[in-house]
Amino acid sequence: MEKVDILRRADIFYDLSGAQLEMLASICEERIVKLGDIIFEENSQGDEMFVIARGAVEILVDPSIVGGPGAKKRGSLPVTIATLRSGQTFGEIVLVDQGLRTASARCAETETQLLAIPRNKFMKLCDTYPEMGYRVMRNIAAELAFKIRGSDLAIREQLLWRPRPAA
């Protein structure tokens, strides 16, 4: 499948023109990862986001990194919080800031094809074509807001269903 077709399926690029998708495709790097391969680790420095062309990727968090009561009981095994499939994106927050990764990403199928979008090349493209940069950043903001709302809901659910100590 062509890079432009892969990008077109991703929500954050839905409103880009054909020419804008071509420009974006020109900076993408194709990667093939195998089952169990770590794409990036939680708390590592990030410099690229990814679009899943084919396959699946698990997003994991390590409860022991957060600490707090019960962290040792939970152990240090990562917990899968999402499984993403073809057409979905991950790691987009590095296009917004240069902070550390908030989760790990691991290949979840025998073979997964990714498009990597390097932050430095993306930012140069945005500087040259600000309308395109605005559209993508607006869509990334909407995607991140959606993910935050989902996390908020999950936290509320856990708080409501957590057993309370006997009085």
Language-model region placement:
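Cytosolic regulatory regions built on CNB/CRP/Popeye-like sensor folds
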Residues: 1-167
